[in-house]
Swiss-Prot record:
Pathway annotation from the record: Protein degradation; proteasomal ubiquitin-dependent pathway
Biased segments, Low complexity type: 72-94
Species of origin: Dictyostelium discoideum (Social amoeba)
UniProt-annotated stretches for the region Disordered: 67-96, 200-219
Job description of the protein: May be part of a complex that binds ubiquitinated proteins and that is necessary for the export of misfolded proteins from the ER to the cytoplasm, where they are degraded by the proteasome.
A cellular-component GO term for this protein: nuclear outer membrane-endoplasmic reticulum membrane network
Name of the protein in question: Nuclear protein localization protein 4 homolog
Matches recorded under PROSITE patterns: MPN (PS50249)
């Protein structure tokens, strides 16, 4: 095997057998005219000398290994006793000076090992000296052994990137280049991290916490505070890091156009890849199977009154109404009452809504009763399509405004002349198109939605989208429980218009019922609100609260007020 031996005169390659001993190496070195007097063979310059009789194989020395021929200080001292005293004294002085220069700091705070400018710090002049994770030479430093509390300049001679870039050594240099970031708003990278800003934010949060604590002591109220830096179960990193699992997911229905950073050109440039990417952003129409509302539970007493009025007009008059009820936890809709706003119907088509001066008050009154707007209903004569393009746009507008579970009820007549009621919603794609204003205000074809920008419909690019892609069927169910509201008072905004005689007839029909049942009529409350029999600010909250709690405690006094006003119309002796 071949062994390399490094000596002060150079490196010598020696060819010995596999059973050779250390003595054979000395012989070979002497044959190659290498001075071996007073020197020993070692594995490293700091290891002890190898025994002359040891086998190389037993010492773990293999072919290709490098050994060292170093001087023996003991032999030199024994051979040169006469001059050793002065040399030893000089060596001791040098060692002591070396120890002093390495252990003690200079007046400017640096040490002889430091290679940076005054004001910077490294492992030898900072409090981080002695960290075991560093594996660099003694005259170097790294981000691991720098003082983490130090806010000065980093050691730029450690950086190997071009000017304007950043690495783990110079993260704290306050120079952010925002256009180089390609991540979301909640993520961070080496380009946008700034420790100084984080420290400032921490101080502001501490001050805010102290202020909140003082306010809590005064008021005694402890607010609910969301836990920050919560790590999800699938994440394997710490609370201050980000991964694919915890980054925000892209919303397919987001109205914001995603940004693309192309490596082929600048911000305002374009290329074939960018054109293909923009083409991929165009919507591809597809049918939606599952609605946001798993079902619509309708009070069929209200639905029958709505249907009877239209049937009595032989579908000459179409109507629109708003559904008031509640949303269940699974997104299903429960309908309690139908409010018909002011409207005008022409040519047997879908009526046009007129300005409603009571819209805000009716919304507030419904809220007092524990109700909210959960849908709308309209009727139409017999036709070949389910919803027109205009109706789809209107439904999408309502659904974006009042929530994804907002439903659309349609009352129609089939070819046999029988009434048919169905529930629908519009798809998420229709919601996105309406939110971004892609629907044109004028729709010439009721079976096609005309758009501003083209979409792909079954592989074909078009601006006239078929309405069938935007309609989602909702299961229509009957309520198993009974609504708390009665439907005896005539519905508002119909022909003929409600008058005081309707109020008198309502009182005569319900003179033997309890005050709770007398007031538990949604249309009767709207009549009181419209004719200002009671004050909306002071009286209606009390009445609505009693209806919600199913109590007649405070309704007797209001019933006497109504009786007195009706008595002026039909005579007070009618109540005796």
């Amino acid at each position: 095997m071949i062994i390399a031996v490094r000596s002060p005169s150079g490196t010598t390659k020696i060819n010995v057998s596999d059973t050779a001993i250390v003595k054979d190496l000395y012989v070979k070195l002497k044959e190659n005219n290498v001075d071996i007097d007073g020197k020993s063979i070692t594995k490293t310059p700091r290891d002890p000398p190898l025994e002359v009789g040891d086998k190389l194989s037993s010492l773990g020395i293999k072919s290709g290994d490098l050994l060292h021929l170093v001087g023996n200080n003991n032999n030199n001292n024994n051979d040169n006793k006469a001059s050793s005293g002065s040399n030893n004294n000089n060596n001791n002085n040098n060692i002591s000076k070396k120890e002093i220069s390495y252990d003690e700091k200079l007046p400017n705070g640096l040490t002889p090992r430091c290679k940076h400018a005054v004001g910077d710090k490294c492992v030898f002049c900072s409090d981080a000296q002695g960290m075991k994770r560093c594996d660099h030479p003694e005259n170097a430093t790294c981000p691991n052994c720098q003082n983490k509390k130090f806010k000065g300049k980093r050691l730029k001679w450690l950086c190997n990137h071009p000017a304007g870039g950043k690495c783990s050594n110079c993260l704290r240099v306050g120079k952010n280049v925002s256009y180089k970031c390609n991540h979301g708003s909640t993520a961070t990278c080496v380009n946008c991290m700034d420790k100084d800003d984080e420290d400032q934010d921490d101080n502001e949060e501490d001050n805010k916490d102290n202020k909140d604590n003082s306010e809590i002591k005064k008021s005694g109220f402890v607010p609910k505070v969301a836990i920050k830096n919560e790590v999800k179960t699938k994440c394997l990193h710490g609370p201050n890091q980000k991964c694919i699992n915890c980054l925000p997911k892209d919303d397919p229905n987001s109205i914001e156009v995603p940004k693309r950073r192309c490596k082929n050109h600048g911000i305002n440039g374009s290329c074939v890849e960018c054109i293909e990417w923009r083409e991929s952003l165009k919507m591809r129409l597809k049918s939606q199977d599952n609605p946001h509302a798993p079902g619509a539970l309708v009070d069929f007493q209200s639905a029958n009154i709505f249907q009877q009025y239209i049937a009595n007009s032989k579908y000459e008059q179409q109507r629109i109404g708003f559904l008031f009820g509640n949303f269940l936890s699974d997104g299903s809709v429960v309908v309690d009452s139908i409010y018909e706003p002011p409207q005008e119907c022409k040519d047997k088509q879908t009526p046009t809504l007129l300005p409603d001066p009571l819209a805000d008050k009716i919304e507030s009154m419904a809220s007092m009763l524990g109700l909210t707007r959960v849908g709308w209903i309209f009727s139409h004569p017999s036709r070949k399509y389910t919803m027109s393009s205009t109706e789809i746009i209107q439904a999408a507008s309502y659904q974006n405004k009042y929530g994804p579970s907002f439903v659309t009820l349609i009352l129609s007549v089939n070819s046999d002349g029988q009434s048919n009621m169905e529930a629908f919603q519009v798809s998420d794609q229709a919601l996105k198109l309406e939110k971004t204003g892609e629907f044109l205000p004028t729709q010439p074809d009721p079976t096609k939605c005309k758009l501003k920008s083209p979409v792909f419909e079954e592989g074909t690019e078009t601006i006239n989208a078929d309405t069938h892609f935007f309609i989602v069927t909702v299961p229509l169910k009957a309520r198993e429980d009974k609504s708390i509201f009665n439907i005896s008072f005539p519905v508002e905004n119909r022909i003929p218009v409600n008058t005081l005689s309707d109020l008198a007839s309502y009182k005569l029909e319900h003179k033997d019922v309890s005050p709770l049942k007398f007031f538990s009529d949604f249309h009767f409350l709207i009549f009181l609100l419209e004719n200002q029999f009671l004050d909306f600010q002071s009286d209606f909250p009390i009445i609505c609260e009693n209806i919600r709690s199913r109590s007649s405690e405070n309704l007797i006094g209001y019933l006497e007020i109504i009786n007195y006003q009706i008595g002026d119309i039909i005579g007070h002796d009618q109540f005796n």
